[in-house]
Amino acid sequence: MKIEVCNVCKQFKKVEVLKNINMVFEDGKIYGFSGRNGSGKSVLLKIICGIYSPTNGEVLIDGKNYNRSNMFVPNLRALIEKPSFFPDLTGFENLKLLAQIQNKITEKEILSALEIVNLIDEKDKKYSEYSLGMKQKLGIAQVIMEDPKVMLLDEPFNGIEEESVQKISDYLLKQKKKGKIIIISTHIKEDLKKLADQIYYFDNGSVK
């Protein structure tokens, strides 16, 4: 799979938040987006996964513009902003409900995803009882259980303890070896230096 960001610009109320961005993402690599909050990195992730459309330019996935065709992007899953689940269901029940919609994810795969993010011991707690870090872990587990070809992760380690960060990082490195494309956006440079093959630095909508 190949993702091409071609001359992408994005404006909100005449404020230009992305300026003529060009990037190429290829199989078997981890890419990092680094920069201050509001620098444009999260906006680009949302454009790549189809939440936003670019004001100008295009994103091509294997040569196809899904933004323009308004189609669901296959084999791509994203953790964008704060994950959202049903508060009165447990972590496991939330993932099981999503798995039933997918109709191809087994209970074993759900439990494996929870194990990877160190949430297996809290799987039977209600989501409303989860801490910020636990909620973040559940969002990552959702992406993991769906086993996509492309993973977009926005501030994935926010509120997560070091032991779990290391475990999730090890998983991501294994997925890279399997040929997956992984894009991680974070303002914490140290997280990216340990994982990313290439880091893009965002500053006021431009990339260095």
Q: Which positions does each model-derived feature cover?
A:
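Conserved ABC ATPase "signature" region
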Residues: K96, E107-E122
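Catalytic Walker B motif of ABC-type/P-loop ATPase nucleotide-binding domains
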Residues: M151-E155
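Conserved ABC transporter NBD signature motif
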Residues: G57-F72
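Helix-to-loop junction immediately C-terminal to a conserved catalytic motif
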Residues: C49
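The feature captures the beta-strand-to-loop junction immediately N-terminal to the Walker
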Residues: S34-R36
